[in-house]
């Protein structure tokens, strides 16, 4: 069994961060070591919440604790998502280096949570800069949305062709694999949800239905990053992992849309996370 150290947010109510990613990864047969960067009552898009940002020292202390019982070498991957403070970025990069020193085959997926095309800035001061200047260079895989694609590449990205160029730029900055979680307004079709996956071997595009919500669910990117990493650790090829992830997330979104509720319906859609009913295919475009 593969093991993922998942360092991201936790909400008591609803689905975001580790709450959105842990159960789906476990469904795929991966053990998840969840380390929370924040503990909030609910996600921040409600406009109000209670809770705390974990002290930056706690990340290193917890990693040390796992190491001291001799288990850190069993960690196959580090996944980072929503980060509560700029100082935590450094701690997460250090945590990955510690894991890598115990297991040289361990990989790092950075979900560079900075913002959302329709939700604006959602992270603390300094986090964006830390992700760009520190985390990206150490990540094997990075999973930006459109806002994050622009920030990481330093390009404007106003159309499909510019998105392709931005992905190519990011591949020169450290990551070996780039999964663009949502092309949003720079996609080819306004009524579709479009994604990219890129390596040095090429760029693949996948398109699936775009569901309409009164309020967009939160945690979709967290779910996407977690499923992609779990699929890779389970031995799927890059494209198999990309397709399974896109199809499983599509099914979760469809179940959520049909339910008429705000929060992701991960439990209700659990069978489709394991075996998606959707069969959308990735097409190589470069």
From Swiss-Prot:
InterPro entries for the chain: PM/HMP-P_kinase-1 (IPR013749), PyrdxlKinase (IPR004625), Pyridoxal_kinase_PdxY (IPR023685), Ribokinase-like (IPR029056)
Record: residues binding substrate: 9, 44-45, 222
EC number: 2.7.1.35
A Pfam family recorded for this sequence: Phos_pyr_kin
Keywords recorded for this protein, A-Z: ATP-binding, Kinase, Magnesium, Nucleotide-binding, Transferase
Catalytic activity: pyridoxal + ATP = pyridoxal 5'-phosphate + ADP + H(+)
Binding site for ATP: 111, 148, 181
Superkingdom of origin organism: Bacteria
Cellular component GO terms, alphabetical: cytosol
Similarity annotation: Belongs to the pyridoxine kinase family. PdxY subfamily.
Role played: Pyridoxal kinase involved in the salvage pathway of pyridoxal 5'-phosphate (PLP). Catalyzes the phosphorylation of pyridoxal to PLP.
Protein name: Pyridoxal kinase PdxY
Organism: Actinobacillus pleuropneumoniae serotype 5b (strain L20)
